[in-house]
Amino acid sequence: MLFRSYREEYDACGCFEYYASGNGIGARVRDAVRANKAYKGKLRQKPICRISAYDVFSAYNEKDPIAISVLHKAVEMWGMASANLVSLLNPQKIIWGGGVFGPAGIFIDDIYKEACKWAQPLSIKQVEFVPSQLSGNAGLIGAAFLAIKNHLYE
């Protein structure tokens, strides 16, 4: 996996998870709100321990500086991760789905631009980034499919 030549902060949950998952996005914002006593933005209106990724996307839409900073970092990490996939596997399409990618679907073009900085140049020109048609229900639908498949073919 591609990494920058320096390390930012470390968290035992792992770099990608810390920056780019729904739980990680919420945790980074909670840390930032706690650390910035002067911050008076939208995310301060709720108990810090209850701030979720959903709140971060809502604050982003209202141009909250902490939400913007955290989500821009997530876009960078999603771009780097997808660049690794493109460079290693040379897919035709990357489908973005899951809980975070309901609201994060607005970033797909930005993720592609970030991936272009890191990916193998010929491969990245041949891949398409698209949102899942299943949105945040991909995991649920996949689990239902497996249950039905296993029940029918036992």
Residues covered by each model-derived region:
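ATP-binding/phosphotransfer module of carbohydrate and carboxylate kinases, centering on a glycine-rich
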Residues: 5-154
